């Protein structure tokens, strides 16, 4: 079982790590008040970066609450998100949502991100390999 902590290795920390996701996102999940950008990281665990600016969420209390709730949701879903670098970008109105609504919205966003993940075809899944026939 993967630990559900949120240590330094589970966070995007440097500008270079954020730029890698911004420059070439593989997964993009827009929501009404949020945008998720994701990129595969080649690691066995996911990493999270948050972009919650004063322009979109005015009060520091709201920004801190959002960060806390997003990190908590990420922590509980990190087993299914393994191998991704994810950047969450807040849009106007995100700070006005209530906590249960935020939990529900992020649960749906994580699932949508997983649905959009490009599938890597293993040799056993390739046509003709599993049944012994060749093209």
From Swiss-Prot:
Transmembrane segments: none annotated. Belongs to the RnpA family. One of its GO terms (biological process) is tRNA 5'-leader removal. It comes from Pseudomonas aeruginosa (strain LESB58). The keyword Ribosomal protein does not apply. This is Ribonuclease P protein component. Keywords: Endonuclease, Hydrolase, Nuclease, RNA-binding, tRNA processing. GO terms for cellular component: ribonuclease P complex.
């Amino acid at each position: 079982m993967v630990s559900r902590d949120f240590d330094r290795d589970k966070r995007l920390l440097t500008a270079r790590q954020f730029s890698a996701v911004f420059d070439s996102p593989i997964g993009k999940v827009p929501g009404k008040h949020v945008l998720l950008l994701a990129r595969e990281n080649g690691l066995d665990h996911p990493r999270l970066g948050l972009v919650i600016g004063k322009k979109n969420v005015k009060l520091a209390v709201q920004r801190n609450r959002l960060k806390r709730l997003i990190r908590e949701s990420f922590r509980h879903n990190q087993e299914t998100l393994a191998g991704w670098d994810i950047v969450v970008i807040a849009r106007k109105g995100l700070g006005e949502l209530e906590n249960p609504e935020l939990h529900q919205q992020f649960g749906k966003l994580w699932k949508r991100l997983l649905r959009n993940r490009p599938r890597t075809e293993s040799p056993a899944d390739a046509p003709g390999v599993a049944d012994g026939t060749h093209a």
